[in-house]
Amino acid sequence: MIKPNIPAPVRPNLPLSSPDSVLPQAMKDPFNIFDDDEPSEDTSSSEQSSRPPPREMMISSSCALREQTNSSFLNRFFPEDDESSENGAALAEINQLLRDGPEAPPREPTPKEARRPEKMQKIFFQTYGNDFKVEAHGDRLLAQNQRVVRLFERGRILGLGVKMNIPMGYCAVTNCFHPPGCVCVMDMAGYGPSDIRAQIVNISSGPLELPPNMLQIHIHMLPMLLPEPWQTINLMAPHQGDTYFDLRLRRPLSLPPRASKNLKFEAGHLCEEDARRCLVIPCRHLATKRVLLDPTVWRPNSLAVLRVLNASDEHVDLEAGMAMAKIIFTTPGITPFKPSLTSVMMSFDVPRSDLKLVKGGRRDYYRAEERMRSGRDSSNEG
């Protein structure tokens, strides 16, 4: 069988004599496929009109080359650093190193500060009665009288309506802005369940009445730190459990009425102020005799000097060996200040701490008490 001679298909727009008539435009000049300039003068007008745009880069009627997109596949394995890549910071750093040359040492990256874990210890308290309004302000309580407080010649002890379980290693200190005519004696409550009270001493010549909201008593929770034995000089051993020291009289003391004296104790300590702060707090039994002791901050490498005031109209005799003040070593930052011009005693400015006082129910209160009892029993057994 003889096959018929079938001619090849011919494009009607181009002549057969042209050798490039069957080739696409991209194959005629392979070195000019990315050239966006005007075509050369040798090409005809029909070839210029049929040339595809450079972005598509047509090779044939059925195949097209497209622009390559940026791949984000490797970003899963090599994540970018937000701080170094922000606003081209990494590229600018490389360019700076190239300009400086190999002699300049590379710049060390700034270390990031480790974030401290937030550890806040909660201490539960309960309120009772209607004589005082108690509010929690973070690490401290504020008690304000809601009724008129009447003070007799010597003064009185007021229950603030606050019960709390003080954990081991802490103490509660009452601090007050002294109203005119009276002094709120600074007092300390140690480890265990405590009913917080305040001692008000009348320093006027007659009875005194305080209107509502006149007494503003702050209750601070302070950690009690125990110094090393070599850091104390002529101080007796601290009390077990409460971790505080005593300052006692070595000879009898006689105070005239309405007179003050500076007592010097031959004792000292070597604790640095940046690590610990030594507080001198008066003993509560002095308030019954209307003897006031100015609370102060005991500086290191110095003798203890205390100011004692007899607020009564009679002579007061104090025996030798009587405890005059309590010594507490706590966190730094506490400074003494005078609340007002009429104040005869100093107060303490206590900075904020990580403690949080929370008003809880009976269940929370008794649970904390059981924990303290179990810890006390285990320590006694040990």
Curated annotation (Swiss-Prot):
One example of a Gene Ontology biological process annotation: dUMP biosynthetic process
**Pfam families from the entry?**
dUTPase
Q: Report the EC code(s) recorded for this entry.
A: 3.6.1.23
What keywords tag this UniProt record? Hydrolase, Magnesium, Metal-binding, Nucleotide metabolism
Pathway in which the depicted protein is active: Pyrimidine metabolism; dUMP biosynthesis; dUMP from dCTP (dUTP route): step 2/2
Q: Which cofactor does it need?
A: Mg(2+)
The reaction(s) catalysed by this protein are: dUTP + H2O = dUMP + diphosphate + H(+)
* Spans annotated as Disordered: 1-60, 97-118
The record's listing under InterPro entries reads: dUTPase-like (IPR029054), dUTPase-like_sf (IPR036157), HSV_DUT (IPR034745)
The protein's superkingdom reads Viruses
Q: Where is the composition biased (Basic and acidic residues)?
A: 100-118
The UniProt regions of compositional bias labelled Pro residues, in chain numbering, are 1-12
Recorded GO terms, molecular function? dUTP diphosphatase activity; metal ion binding
Q: Could you say which protein family the record assigns here?
A: Belongs to the dUTPase family.
**What does it do?**
Involved in nucleotide metabolism: produces dUMP, the immediate precursor of thymidine nucleotides and decreases the intracellular concentration of dUTP to avoid uracil incorporation into viral DNA.
Q: What is this protein called?
A: Deoxyuridine 5'-triphosphate nucleotidohydrolase
Q: What gene name is given for the protein in this entry?
A: DUT
